[in-house]
A protein has these predicted regions:
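Surface-exposed assembly/interface segments
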Residues: 1-180
Length: 180
């Protein structure tokens, strides 16, 4: 899936992840950002990172909010647990300090709750359609890449409720054997 909980069972199943990108009619990201439920956790709408801009590209930024949807972690449903502003969908994007600004790297290194998985391009066997496009998860190169124009977010904000995690008290012998 697009996101995977670090904790199995009810804790992982309590999580929701919401992304706000730059896709809206004026290309600034402000229309979707202003309507986004988690706007208050971020300073401004996503746009273009300085790294991608320096290569002539645009619209690579997203905001990611990790939410305690059911209140299992914080005690209050709907609490924003983590906010990741101005991440890039370009796989080689760098922050101003030289570290990776690629959303999968940042989430893997910093999140206490989730990993970023694979998005469903076009539609999967269940008919899921997270987005369609070719530029996400590719390297930014010199030229006029427009990461936003290749992404169809619908409203520009996608939200995933994590489900399917199972709690287990202990592993049996066959569980260990299947693991090797």
């Amino acid at each position: 899936g697009a996101f995977i909980g670090r904790f199995p069972g009810s804790l992982g199943n309590s999580l929701q992840v919401s992304i706000c990108g730059t896709s809206d009619s004026d290309g600034s990201g402000s229309i979707n950002f202003n309507a986004w439920a988690y706007k208050s956790s971020f300073d401004a709408a996503p746009g273009t990172s300085s790294y991608v801009s320096g290569l002539g590209g645009k619209n690579d930024e997203i905001h990611v909010a990790v939410i305690d949807e059911d209140g299992e972690i914080s005690g209050t449903a709907g609490t924003v647990l983590e906010a990741y502003p101005f991440l890039s969908v370009a796989s080689n994007a760098k922050a101003t300090d030289g570290t990776s600004n690629y959303y999968k790297d940042v989430i893997r290194e910093r999140s206490e709750y989730i990993y970023a998985g694979a998005f469903h391009r076009n539609s999967d066997s269940d008919g899921a359609n997270d987005f369609s496009g070719a530029l996400w998860d590719t390297a930014a190169v010199n030229g006029s890449q427009n990461f936003q124009s290749d992404v169809t977010f619908g409203t520009g904000q996608n939200t995933w409720s994590l489900t399917g995690g199972v709690s287990s008290s202990s592993l049996g012998t066959d569980d260990y054997l299947r693991g090797f």
